[in-house]
Amino acid sequence: MAEIKPFYCVRPAAESASRVAALPYDVYNREEAKREVEKEPLSFLSIDRAETWFPDDVDTYDERVYVKAGEVLKEMEEKGIFVAEEVPCYYLYELTMNGHTQTGITACSSVDDYLNQIVKKHENTREDKEVDRIRHCLLY
């Protein structure tokens, strides 16, 4: 059986959640992401696609983009748009699409459980996208 634990989360404050909510980063191209952030500056895309803060000639994977993502998240946290949990928590979520509802849990799990396939991956990912997301998270 998988070992899971609660974790400290930085999440949108309840009053900001509807403005922060965004579709996954990889369903937008750069121009679409930029338009979404212009329409809603609190959108998580302003962090998740931080290249929207730069001219188009700045590469999406430029180090400045990752630094900006961390700066924007910290600024939003300072303004109370995001809040840091004071105690570790589990998070339940529910997704409904085409009349089908799924319920899930977000928690920390053991790397060994993942490597031993006790925790199953939900999709095949590309290494370049994994590196991008890792770099994105490390600058917070």
Sequence positions of predicted segments:
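A cross-family signal for N-terminal binding/gating loops and helix N-caps
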Residues: 1-139
